[in-house]
Amino acid sequence: EDARQVIPHLADMFGEPFADSSQIPTYLVSKITREHVTVSLSGDGGDELFCGYNTYYSIDRIWNKTKRIPFPVRKMASVMIGAAGEVRHGGLATRARLLGAETIEDMYLRSEIGEGISLVKKQGKTGAAWIPDVWKEILPWEAGHTIMDEYPGGLLEVPQHNLMLMDLLMYHPDDILNKVDRTAMAVSLETRVPMLDKDVIEFAW
């Protein structure tokens, strides 16, 4: 019941659609915390800095197995498998998406975004034609620029380090830090992120 009561207030907190369901529990935790303190510490950044997500390792294993197959062959197989209606969802659909990855960074995004990867790529080609006209009028949309353009990829020798860097440059500021700051400030709770201290980041890298 507490969670449902938060939903009508989400638009006030974020000012725009924000597709992270943990925004609700984060708000509730912040609200309880604010009853006792005015400043709190967040552990965000630890997984991205010290390779704490299992996905970093699993994607590396999958990539090492699939990269031996020529990309055109993988891409064709991905399209053929994904075209079958009965495999649009579930494990087989996920494998089809991963097969179509051109780089390990692309594969990581496909694993995290899921079916949304096709929309992300379509945005750059069609000028977001899939977005309802009402949203185009409310929010200006810059055609030809997608999340795929934010990170050049392959900057670091260790594959997992590239995935960690992707999260630090995109997922962390655009999702995690945004979510924590907005939900906490909605109850007048300030947050500090010691893991993102300059010295900690330099030590991690």
What is each of the regions a protein language model found here?
Residues 1-141, 182-205:
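ATP-dependent adenylate-handling active sites, centered on carboxylate activation for C-N bond formation
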Residues 2, 6, 158, 169, ...:
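N-proximal short alpha-helices
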Residues 19, 154-167:
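Structural motif
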Residues 26, 46, 161-169, 173, ...:
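Short runs of predominantly hydrophobic/aromatic residues within well-ordered alpha helices
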Residues 33, 168-182:
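Short Ser/Thr-interspersed hydrophobic loop/turn segments at strand-loop and sheet-helix junctions
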Residues 139-152:
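A short, charged helix-loop
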